[in-house]
Amino acid sequence: GHASGQLEKNVADVSSRADGLSGNLQRERETLELIIGEYERTLNIQLWKNYADVFTVILQTPSGQEIIVQPDKNGRQDVLTNGTEVLVYAGQPSPYSVWQEIFFDLLPRDRYIESGIWTFHLIPEKIVLGSYQLYLPTQQSRSADTRFVRPDPLLTMTVPSTAQKVISVGAIHSYYEAYADFSGRGEKI
């Protein structure tokens, strides 16, 4: 209907020109590398997965510290690493969506977040579908050096066809409120 067309436009505005990669997790663990350039003040990463899939996510910092994320424990996680504070938010189940968003917010403990290769390890436990997508914010809000090692060219140009119809307006609006810099609107005065 009319509302869904508007919704898709909003999602496209958020995710278009974002760097992304996608994959299908089955029996083997997957390793995804993200290069974070120097002088990056903040960065957020979205991981979209199917609620039916159970897998462990381990985020490894450039200095080797491992953060174990449990996506099925809904809520929030806050970890201090070498130079970076890592906030993790796991989306709540919704009757309208089969997709769960896990949102990583990297914040500097001093001026910049830790540069180098950050690695996502996805370790399958109970996989029903296995598909996932990982996104960075649009190019304007990050340095040119910050990118996935093997970006997916399709995802770089488009939003996830699956997510654009199922994402809830509420989630977009709550993220806009929480992450003014991410939305591109800047601080409210």
Model-derived features: where do they sit?
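Loop-rich non-cytosolic ectodomains and luminal regions
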Residues: 1-189
